[in-house]
Amino acid sequence: GNRGNRAAQALAEACRTGREPELSVLEHERFVLLYPEILLAMRVNNFLEREHITVENALYTTNATTALNLTAENYGFCFVNETAVHNAPNRGELLFFDLDSPDLVHPLSVVYKKKRHLLPAARAFVDAARRFLQSQSWRSECDCRVEHGRPV
């Protein structure tokens, strides 16, 4: 969410004071969402349904960077993969919340042709990606991490 948005500020304040953030504050907010046929959007829709949050006002895009840019301009809240936090444009205008929900887990695969020699650069990429994602160092870039209903 945008740092100037009241709902985002309420969520951040709950995190700062050690209270569980009430996602119900998002109920009447605008959202910048990915089109529903995109896999991440399907996961977000499932999450919102489980949290009983009805989206009444949404702008749709195919691109997460566009969603972040629009959120930075306070056009609404968006959902992005955790790794998007690191490279987010207009980082200073945004508040990031790691919701740590199984509904939002988005698998990542590296696919290459079987029985082919993997080039050293490709192997280095796979190893670097695995180390980065397993280290969860990206989590430190979130403004608030909610783990099993408790702010961390």
Q: Where are the regions a protein language model picked out?
A:
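Low-complexity basic/metal-binding stretches
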Residues: G1-R6, C15-G18, R145-H148
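Residues embedded in well-ordered beta-strands
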Residues: N5-A7, V32, F77, L95, ...
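A bilobed periplasmic-binding-protein/Venus flytrap-type ligand-binding module shared by bacterial periplasmic
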Residues: G1-N2, A7-A12, L108-L118
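Hydrophobic hinge/microswitch elements
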Residues: E37-F96
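C-terminal effector-binding regulatory domain of bacterial HTH transcription factors
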Residues: R50, E82-R91, S101-V152
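Secondary-structure junction motif
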Residues: C15-L23, E27-E51, L118-D127, L133-C144
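Residues at the C-termini of beta-strands that transition into short coil/loop
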Residues: G1, Y35, D98-D100, K114
